């Protein structure tokens, strides 16, 4: 019992230090990226970047069914039950399948909502010009942002903390290497491509690690979707409370 407790403390300290280092790297890279972004985009470009980023955050949070949070609890409960019964990992794989299935549905839902609300968002956000097309073009970014949230939930629930740390480090560095040249060459025209690349890279890195835990797959059968209702109920509560 004492050895188990000591190992638990060692595990906590180890990953606290790891995530602290990752956070420090993220802050340093973020400062450099923001400095170059402000230099190449100017005040108006920074304003556009902020508005589009806020739109992505709001729509993805509202349309993701709360899966980035509820998915962690849903999978963790299955994993804990499997550990206690020493059974196969079928229940865990089934839980991951549900999370990925509903993440995909939520991603399509978020993209469709973004397209439909494009004119409304333009009128609500801007008092000059017509940026409806820009908001519509955010749909693929929202799609991959929601998908990435589902894969992140899988990594958290299965305890892949090292993978999460690696993903965060690589994402910060890659975003710096991609965004600065794009803003330098294209200026404000590069904002939407950079936001899309960020969302896609986040999903791709998460998927690279999560597929090692459970092979990718979705199931749109009625029985499978019904089995995911507890996931949706919990996720809906998180969305409403957030």
Region locations from a protein language model:
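Hydrophobic transmembrane helix module of multi-pass membrane transport proteins
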Residues: 12, 53, 57, 102-242
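Transmembrane-helix boundary and interhelical linker motifs in polytopic inner-membrane proteins
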Residues: 2-10, 41-45, 59-101, 156-163
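Juxtamembrane loop-transmembrane helix junctions in multi-pass integral membrane proteins
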Residues: 14, 44, 48, 91-98, ...
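Small-residue-rich midsections of specific transmembrane alpha-helices
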Residues: 23-26, 32-33, 46, 50-79, ...
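Helix-terminus/linker motif at the lipid-water interface of multi-pass membrane proteins
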Residues: 28-46, 122-123
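Positions in alpha-helical segments
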Residues: 34-35, 73, 153, 238
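N-terminal membrane topogenesis motif
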Residues: 1-29, 90-97, 210, 223-241
């Amino acid at each position: 019992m004492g050895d188990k407790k000591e190992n638990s403390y060692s595990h906590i300290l180890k990953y606290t230090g790891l995530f602290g280092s990752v956070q420090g790297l993220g802050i340093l890279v973020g400062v450099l990226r923001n400095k170059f972004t402000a230099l190449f985009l100017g005040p108006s470009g920074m304003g556009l970047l902020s508005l589009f980023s806020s739109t992505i955050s709001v729509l993805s949070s509202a349309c993701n069914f709360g899966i980035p949070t509820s998915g962690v609890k849903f999978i963790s409960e299955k994993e804990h039950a499997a550990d206690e019964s020493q059974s196969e990992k079928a229940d865990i794989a089934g839980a991951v399948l549900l999370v990925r299935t509903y993440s995909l549905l939520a991603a399509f839902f978020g993209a469709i909502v973004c397209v439909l609300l494009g004119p409304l968002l333009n009128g609500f956000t801007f008092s000059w010009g017509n940026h409806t097309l820009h908001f519509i073009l955010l749909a693929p970014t929202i799609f991959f942002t929601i998908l990435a949230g589902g894969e992140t939930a899988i990594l958290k629930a299965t305890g892949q903390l090292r993978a999460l740390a690696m993903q965060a480090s690589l994402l910060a560095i890659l975003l710096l290497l991609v965004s600065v040249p794009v803003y330098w060459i294209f200026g404000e025209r590069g904002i939407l491509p950079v936001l899309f690349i960020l969302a896609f890279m986040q999903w791709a890195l998460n998927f690279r690690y999560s597929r090692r835990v459970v092979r990718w797959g979705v199931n749109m059968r009625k029985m499978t979707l019904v089995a995911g209702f507890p996931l949706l109920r919990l996720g809906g509560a998180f969305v409403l409370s957030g």
